[in-house]
Amino acid sequence: EPDLLARLPNFRRRMEWFLSHRPDLAALVSRWQEPGLGERRLLALVRGHRMKRLLRRMLDDTEFLSKYGVRALSKYHEAHPYMLEHEGMRFGVGYVPGESNSGLFGGNSNWRGPIWMPVNYLLVESLYEFHRYYGDDFKVECPTGSGRFLSLREVADEVSRRLCCLFLRGEDGRRAVLGDSPMMQRDPAFRDNVLFYEYFHGDTGQGVGASHQTGWSGLVALLLHPRPAAASCSLSINERMEAHAPGSL
C-alpha cells in the first residue's frame, strides 16, 4: 500500500538498493517498480505470466482442482505415478486421495492427494491479495478448459465456495464431510454436529484423519462469511472474527 511504504522509508531504500544492485535476483521476482491498482507495489516470487501458468494447472479439474478445494497432489499421478530410481532402488509417488497407503509418518497423515484446509486457506488469501494489485483486468480460465475467465478475486471466491461445500448440505441434503455413514448423515444427534477433520478426501470430500482438527479446518468459518470488497489478509484473525461477530451479521 502507498501509505505503508511512506511510513517505511528505510525499508523502501534498502529494497530499491537491492533490486538495482542485484538485477540477477531482481529478475526472478515481481517487478517492484511497476505500480498496480491503486498505486500498490507487489513483492512476490511469481510474476503475472508465471502465475497464469501455475493457475492453469491448479485450476484443472483433471489435476489439482477438486469439487471441494485444491488437492495436495495432481490426480494425474493416479494413473501416472512419479517414479525415481536411486542406487538400484525404485521409488514411486502416486495420487492417494484419502487415507495413506503407507506407514510413513504414522500412517494416518497423507499429503499425496487429499484436500488440506490450511494450504487451501493460504491459497485463497493469496489470490485475494494478488487481485488487490492486478485488479479485474487480470483474468485466468477457471476451471481450465471451461472457456470461463475470472479475475483472481473471483477465482478465490470459487475455491472458497468449494471448500465450504465440504461442510454445507448439498441439494441431496448430505454433507460431504460426513461421508457415506447413514447415521452421521441422517441421525439428528450427529448430522448437524459437524467435526473438523484433519484433511479431506480429494475426490469425495469425506473427512479423514483426526476428527477434531479445529486448529486449522476451523478456518472454514472465515470463508463462510461474505468478504468485504476492500478486505485484506493484513487484518489479524481476531480482527476478521470481530468483523464477523454475531452482532454484526
Question: Which residues are covered by each model-predicted region?
Answer:
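Acidic, mature catalytic/reactive cores of soluble proteins
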Residues: E1-L249
